Structures are given as C-alpha cells and as structure tokens.
C-alpha cells in the first residue's frame, strides 16, 4: 500500500523530519522538495520514480532502498549509510555523497552530473553503462567495483582505490586519475582521451586492445600488466615501470619512453617508431 499521501501530509505540517523512521514505506512516484531527513531511517524503502530536490539525507540510514528511475537533484547524502541501495537508471544532479557508505550499490545505467563522491566507500558497487559527468570521486574506495562500459567525462578520480575493478570497454575523457590504485583492474578495450594516470599503480592490470593515444602515464607502475595490441601513440611513459609487462604488438609510436624500465617485458611485435627511448632500460 502506498505511503505517499502519509509522507506528504507529514512534511507539509513539518518539513523537518530528522530522526524519523520510514522503513518499508512505499513512496513510489513521490515528489518532495526542501525536506530534511537527517539521521532518519529508510530501510528497504521504495522511492522508485520519485522526484527529489533539495532533500537532506545526511547521516540517514537508507540500506537496501530503491531509487530506481528517480530524478534526484541537489540532495545531501553526506555520511549516510546507503549500503545495497539501487539507483539504477536514476538521474542525479548536484548531489553530495561525501563520506557515505555506498557498498554494494547499483548505479547501472544511471546519469550522474556534478555529484561529489569524495571519500565514499563504493566497494563492490555497480556502474554498468553509467554516464558520469563532472563528478568528484577523489580518494574514494571502489574495490572490485563493476564499471563495464561506463562513460566518464571531466571528472576527478585522483587517489581512488579501485583495485580489481572492471573498467572494460569504458570511455573516459578529461579524467584525472593521478595516484590511483588500480592493481589488477580490467581496462580491456577501454578508450582513454586526455586522461592523466601519473603515479598510478596498475600492477597486473589488463589493458589489452586499449585505445590510449596521448594519455599521461608518467611514473606509473605497470609491472606484470598486459598491454597486448594496445594503442599508446604519443603517450607519456617517462619513468614508467613496466617490469615483465606483456607489450606484444603494443603501439608506442611517438611515445615518450625515456627513463622507463622495461626489463623482462615482452616486446614482440611492439611498435616503437619515432618513440623517445632515451635512457630506457631494456635489460
């Protein structure tokens, strides 16, 4: 049974519902604006197809709730517990998720714009085919997250820990990933444009067939990684560490490999035409 009329009646009388318990409520299609639910509890609450704007969910508990297909604008989720929440196919604009717990969340096919996820826990979350524009994920945890076919533009992922995450077939444009931990991550068939990976850790990462022309890889650690047939034309690998990397058929045309460490790397059929190999260590 829908609880929409009940919640609307409550917030019309008192828009400040901090600390309330709305667990299990069916709020499908509800439209709320300017309401505060700080420290409130919304366990397993349905807010699918809802329209939410200027809502305060800071430090609220919303575990296992559903915002599927919701339109969410300028909502504050900072320090909230959102474990297991689904935002599948939702549209989120200008939302604040700073320091929130988003483990096992589902953002599949959602559209995120101007959102702040700095310092959030997104372990085991799903961003399958999600569109992310001008968002901040700096220093967030995304261990073993599923980001296959994600489209990311003009966003910050510096210092993120995305060990073991799946970013295969992803498309990134103007993304800052400096100092990111991406050990054993899957970038198979990704397309990176104007991406900065300086000082990132990609030990054991999979970059087979990746399209990364012109990308910044300065001082990156790619030990034991697989770059088979990847395109790094014009990319910057100055001081990069590629010990035992698989570079079979990799295109380094006009790339900067100066001072890079390629000892025991597989260079069979690798293309280094017009590449800068000054002080490159091959053996």
Q: Model segments located where?
A:
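Tandem repeat scaffolds
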Residues: 3-283
